[in-house]
Structures are given as C-alpha cells and as structure tokens.
Amino acid sequence: AEYDPFHAGHAAHIAATRAAGATHIAVVMSGNFTQRGKPALLPKQRRVAMALKCGADLVIELPLPWAMAPAEVFATGGVSLLQALGCVQVLSFGCECGDAASLQLVASAMDASAYNAALRQAMQAGVSYAAARQTAASVSCGEETAALLAYPNNTLGIEYIRAAARLGAGFDFLGVRRQGAGHHDEAIADGIASGTALR
C-alpha cells in the first residue's frame, strides 16, 4: 500500500478484509516517498496511525528501492516482506474488478511461455508497453480477461499474484473491489475521493 494519503477507500478495504475473516491484518506500506518518485502527502508516521486506527494490526515499511519502483518490483518487495513474517495466509488487495480469480488467470497468462514472444511482437508493431502487455496476455487468457490490465489496481494485484508465485509464497488471494472514485479520478464518487483527487 501507499496510503498517499490514507482515505475512506483504504478504510473500506481494511474493513472488507476483516469482514472476510481476517483475525489480524498486516500492511506493507511505502515510507515517505511513493511509486511516482514524489514525497508522500503526509509523513509515514501519520499514515501508519491512520491505518492502525482503521483496523490494521501491523504496518511494515516497504524499503525505498521497492517503494519507488514499477509495479512488478513494488509487488515483489511487499510480498517478500509478508512471506518473511511466516504467518500470512491471505494476501488482500484492492482492485477495480474485485475478482482475484480473474486476476490469477491474467497472472498465469503473463507467466506462460507464449507471453514474452507475443509481447516482443506487439512492441515491434509500435504499440505502447501497456497495450503490448494486454495483447500478449490475451494470447493465453482471451481479450476480455486480459483487458483487466487496463486498470492500475488490477495491474498491481496481478503483480502481487505473480510475485507470490515466483517467491513460492503459498498465499490465498482476496481481491476487494475498489469503491468510490477511480484511481486517476479527480472528482468524488459515492462519497469517496481517490488519492489523486486528495493530492
């Protein structure tokens, strides 16, 4: 998580994780700098206090090299810390689709042998990296499922799943549907503003 800043959607995610049966909730959170390479709006201590007040039991800082990295590296750092705890059974994350099983299909497609060749072919055709990833994943999981990559929280969820597979973490996954405004929306939706709007 980044919690930049902590908002009602983050509180809803923690509550949904608890409602799904979590007896304890450990969060891995970036420190004072975020994936965008910018300082977080609030210091990490304030964001930790908000997370604890809203139901998290433990907040672990994701070290800077992972916190400021692309989704694949960010996810690997977070998953490795949770795995090191030795007690995590379920990895819960927010996502636009709310369906961890569908995200697992995309993750498997991206780890299939045909993926890299299809990715190279799409990149050579001149499409953006994001579009090329989606095209390459569709070879194994179909266009509709691969389209889940078009959404940033889905993409991060997919990278958490891929990291868990690479690291041999035996986690189950809980995808909690994002509530309120979309990731990049600057308007409030259903009483919940995105981090983008708040920043």
Where are these regions (language model features)?
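N-terminal catalytic cores of NTP/NDP-binding nucleotidyl/phosphoryl-transfer enzymes
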Residues: 1-47
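A glycine-rich helix N-cap at a beta->alpha junction
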Residues: 48-64
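Generic alpha-helix structural propensity
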Residues: 42-46, 54, 69, 73, ...
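Structural preference for beta-strand elements that scaffold enzyme active sites
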Residues: 24-26, 59, 90
